[in-house]
Regions:
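Serine hydrolase/lipase
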Residues: 2-29, 43-190
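Gly/Ala-rich beta-loop-alpha elbow adjacent to hydrolase catalytic centers
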Residues: 30-34, 38
Length: 190
């Protein structure tokens, strides 16, 4: 269990940093698989009485859905805001698919069968969505993908190597790619 493996070392490091920087807030972040880990970690911190530090917020980048509707409904959003960044060509934030995505894609040739497998999983998005558009601008509280946007993304994925390369570049967090272009336009990159 990844959370169990990380629990003690991360809490220990948080405590060390809190000792070095008293009064400073704690933020949890994660990219890709690290997004749900940060989110689940924050929930566990909140619901563990022995843990006296609560994150100020969770920021995720390219995060898959962290849990099902029950997890989302019971997450302490009032205490720990979750801000999730999603890049327009990144498919990772769409998995596991939500019920809306399954309904949207379930009757489509090729991908429909794949989506039907996930029926009943009941995964859901969590937190405030910040969408990075084609011009690398961050759009706040953009609704989930429309059917037209979903079709366009699906065609990009199945277009072959060029489309897959675009999708892979959109998922990256390195300088000059995907998430860095939208979240850090003035640059920390050389």
């Amino acid at each position: 269990n990844a959370l169990e493996t990380l629990w003690s070392p991360v809490l220990n490091q948080i405590n060390v940093l809190k000792g070095l920087f008293p009064g400073k807030p704690v933020y949890l972040t994660g990219h890709s698989k690290g997004g749900p880990m940060a989110t689940i970690f924050a929930a566990r911190m909140h619901f563990t009485p022995a843990v006296t530090t609560e994150p100020e917020a969770v920021y995720t980048f390219a995060s898959p859905h962290p849990g099902d509707k029950d997890f989302v409904d019971n997450f302490p959003l009032a205490n720990i805001p979750v801000i999730r960044y999603e890049n327009r060509l990144d498919i990772v934030p769409l998995v596991p698919p939500t019920e809306a995505a399954i309904t949207l894609a379930g009757n489509k040739p090729v991908i429909g069968k794949l989506f039907k497998i996930a029926e009943g999983w009941n995964y859901a998005s969590l937190g405030e969505r910040r969408y990075i558009d084609k011009q690398h601008q961050v759009i706040y509280n953009k609704p989930e993908l429309t059917p037209k946007e979903f079709r366009k993304l699906a065609w990009t994925v199945i277009a072959g190597p060029c489309g897959l390369r675009k999708v892979a570049m959109a998922h990256m967090y390195t300088c000059g790619n995907g998430y860095m272009l939208g979240t850090c336009p003035s640059g920390v990159c050389p």
